[in-house]
Structure formats: structure tokens, C-alpha cells
Amino acid sequence: MSSPGPSQPPAEDPPWPARLLRAPLGLLRLDPSGGALLLCGLVALLGWSWLRRRRARGIPPGPTPWPLVGNFGHVLLPPFLRRRSWLSSRTRAAGIDPSVIGPQVLLAHLARVYGSIFSFFIGHYLVVVLSDFHSVREALVQQAEVFSDRPRVPLISIVTKEKGVVFAHYGPVWRQQRKFSHSTLRHFGLGKLSLEPKIIEEFKYVKAEMQKHGEDPFCPFSIISNAVSNIICSLCFGQRFDYTNSEFKKMLGFMSRGLEICLNSQVLLVNICPWLYYLPFGPFKELRQIEKDITSFLKKIIKDHQESLDRENPQDFIDMYLLHMEEERKNNSNSSFDEEYLFYIIGDLFIAGTDTTTNSLLWCLLYMSLNPDVQEKVHEEIERVIGANRAPSLTDKAQMPYTEATIMEVQRLTVVVPLAIPHMTSENTVLQGYTIPKGTLILPNLWSVHRDPAIWEKPEDFYPNRFLDDQGQLIKKETFIPFGIGKRVCMGEQLAKMELFLMFVSLMQSFAFALPEDSKKPLLTGRFGLTLAPHPFNITISRR
């Protein structure tokens, strides 16, 4: 357990992650006439920095920032910049390939240097990283009212208008919208057996698509993504889309491409200079066009629902929202329930609900392909409890501890949202003896939490039995938090758990999965983005 209070950093030369953040930016060659001016400027800036750090005394330890640029956020650089920076040569010199290292890994290494709670600066913004379960729980649960806000990130603010349920600021409007959204999703089956038939029905299409490949290798990404998206569509839109539907395929492509641009392109510079968003070329122009296309698609669906709304028999989330919106307008002229907010909530549900569960299932397929002994035990348990002919049910969960433990172990190792969604403090506070000022950006490193050797024995090993007791029964560990904890916990957690169990068991019941012969072992580092996605891989299937 983490001990409270500031800890002294080691006296010896720190390891490579700390050196990366403390290294000088390089020597400037100047003509003599500019030297004096530069020197005066540097003295002023260093004085400003020193005074600022004096004011911030008591914050968690961390690498010394440079004036203006702070630590320059090297640990958060996307691959397109990381490959072009001095970070690349220094990490390679340390024997690490920067192209496959995500920020969650670099931050975990820094925690070994500075402690489980440490800080760094991006420009003048203070960032505090929480690296173990106890600090995450104290912040997000015990001080939830202080740590539940979202930071004001220019790119996110422009794209989302700070609406929806994922990126909206913490307050009365967010609470109202989240409460309604969660209760409405539960009404349509979230976490209930009534949603089972839709998931099982969708698996039939997955099975048919996979069987088309016969014994040939194929990439399962689009098949899984289509299926997961359709389950969200059935809840939100009241319909599913055929996998060959051109509009549906285009929308999934737009959303995937939009996320890629936002997280791994020059568009990230919008967070420094917001006006860059409106540049008429390159990824800036492409992102704006994608926004227009997604907006057109979702607003057409909302309009269709308005025209066909049956007030006595609402069919889906949009119908329920429209009815609630009408009721609110009668009683509250300042209500936050309007078409624009509905649009952003639908976008949140569609994008976040698709990306997280899709990648969790893909990781499961990859780990089964890499661990045939574990896959065989899962097959045996499915055969014993369900057999070959009956579809799985959530009621089977209690009798399938090894299968459940296998899913949990995949989630532990791959934590699909490794740094959660960043939080922000809404007032000054103290966390384990450290001063955390108002407006501090908080990064809960869930990846680090799930690889903490103080909690998990041999944390790098894939070992489902760690979730089983001596009698082979499932152990519920409070330190297992792949969906986060606190007031901002993933709203779709129950849906994701249902989809993961029913889809995974259905896949294992129907097929055995393997990597193609003579193929290279896929990297297990993952691709950092909104979620931690596996690198592209192919698999082969054999009927069971």
C-alpha cells in the first residue's frame, strides 16, 4: 500500500524515462549581437519558472520543467511526432523502440523514479499521474466531487462543444444527462437478460462472415466492429445495419479515421493554436469534412425518429429522449435537453461503445490464438456447461469461472482505456500529503494499476488462474478496475460485460482460433489512441 506524504527521489542518476524529460533542448548557435538579448530573456524566464515552482511547493515530485515548454509532454507525444523528436534517438539508445511504446508505459516507468503520484508540466499546465490503486481510489472515489471534472482541451471543446456524457464538464447538466441516459439504456435492456437475444442474434452474422473465409487467414477487425456497432445501433436507433450497407460502412470508416486524425496527426497542434483547426488543407480540412458527414448521418436518423415518433410506444433511446425533451420544455424553459445535446450523446454512445468493446474482443481472440492451452480449457468448460447446440446465456456465467477469469485476465493486461479519460480538479485539495491545485489535469494510469507487482504476482504473465481460488471459483478483486471507478466510471460497463461474455463464449463455442502458420508473432504493446487497440493481425479458424 502506498505510504502517504512526499517521498524522496533516489540520489543516483535517474533511469531513462526521467532523463528524457529532463534533457536539454539543445544548444543554440547565435551571433554575438543576439547573445545578450537571449541571456536576459532566459534569466527572466528562469526567474519566472523558479517563482512559479515556489508557489507550487508541495505538489507531487517530478522532472524539472523548462520555462514555457514545461516538460514538453514528450510522454504524451503521438507516434507521428515521437518519431521526429529527440525522444526517438534517446529511447533507442536505451534499447527501447519508441514507435511501439505508448504513453502509459513511459508514465509507468516514471512512477518507479518519482513514486506512485508524480507530476510534470505540459507548457504551464500541471499534470498529475496516479499510478497505483490506492491513489486512484482516494482521488476518484473518496474525493470524487473534486476529481470528477474534465480538462478544457481545445480540440475536444471544438469537436464536442463540451456536450455529451464523456467529455462534458462535471456539474448539474452532466448529472441530469447521465442519469437520464443510464436509466433509459437500462429500460431497453442494459445489464438485463432482455438484451441477450439481440447479442446472440448479432453473433449469427459474425459466424456467417467468418465462415466465408474457410481455412484462409483473415483480419477479424471489421467483422467484430460491425457486430458491436450494431448492438449499440439497436439500443440507440432501434435498428441494425447489414454489414454490406454502404452508409453504415462509411460511418464506421469515418469514425475510425476521425479518431486516428484527432489522436495521431498534426491536428493535435490545435491544442496549442486553436485557430489551426480551420486551416483549409491537410488533416484539418479532412477532419472538418468527417465531422460534417457524421453530423449529417446522425441528424438524419434523429429527424426520421421525430417524424415517426409513437408517443405511446417509444422504440429506442432516441424516442425516449425526444419524449423527455418535450416534457422538459413544458416545465423548464432553460432545460439542457435539446436536439443538439441528443446528437452529442448519441455520438458518445456510438463511438465509445463501439471502440472499447471491439478492441476488448479483438484482444481476446489474439490471446487465445497465442495461448492454445488456455483456449482448450475454455473450450472444455463451454462444452461441459453449455454444449454445442444451445446458445450461451448470462445465467451460465456463475458456472463458467475459468472462462470469466480468462476474459478478466485479457482485460487486465490490455486495459483498453489505459489512461482513462483525463480528469481535472475543480478546487484545491490534498492527496496523500501532496498539494493538488485547482485546474490540475489528472491522469489515472489504469495500465500501471493492473501491472503493479505489489498487487499482481508476475504481472507481465498471462495467467487466468490468478482470478480463481483453490476451489476454482472466481475471485472478485477490488483492484481490478478496467472500466475505471468513481462518478465518471464507464456508463456502458454493464453492456460491455454482457457483450464480452456472450460474444466471446459464442466465438469459442463455434471455432478454434490460431495464428497463420509461419506468421510473425503480433506485437502485444497495442496502438495507443482513444483506446488501446491491438496491432493488425490475421487469424485462421477451424469449426468445432
UniProtKB/Swiss-Prot annotation:
Domain of life: Eukaryota
Tissues/organs with expression: Widely expressed with stronger expression in thymus, heart and cerebellum.
Listed GO CC annotations: cytoplasm; endoplasmic reticulum membrane; intracellular membrane-bounded organelle; mitochondrial inner membrane
Cellular localisation: Endoplasmic reticulum membrane; Microsome membrane; Mitochondrion inner membrane
Chief location category: endoplasmic reticulum
One matching Pfam family: p450
Membrane topology per record: Multi-pass membrane protein
Pathway(s) where this gene product acts: Lipid metabolism; arachidonate metabolism
Xref: CDD domains: CYP2U1
Classification via PANTHER family: CYTOCHROME P450 2U1, CYTOCHROME P450 508A4-RELATED
Function: A cytochrome P450 monooxygenase involved in the metabolism of arachidonic acid and its conjugates. Mechanistically, uses molecular oxygen inserting one oxygen atom into a substrate, and reducing the second into a water molecule, with two electrons provided by NADPH via cytochrome P450 reductase (CPR; NADPH-ferrihemoprotein reductase). Acts as an omega and omega-1 hydroxylase for arachidonic acid and possibly for other long chain fatty acids. May modulate the arachidonic acid signaling pathway and play a role in other fatty acid signaling processes.
Protein name, as recorded: Cytochrome P450 2U1
Protein source organism: Homo sapiens
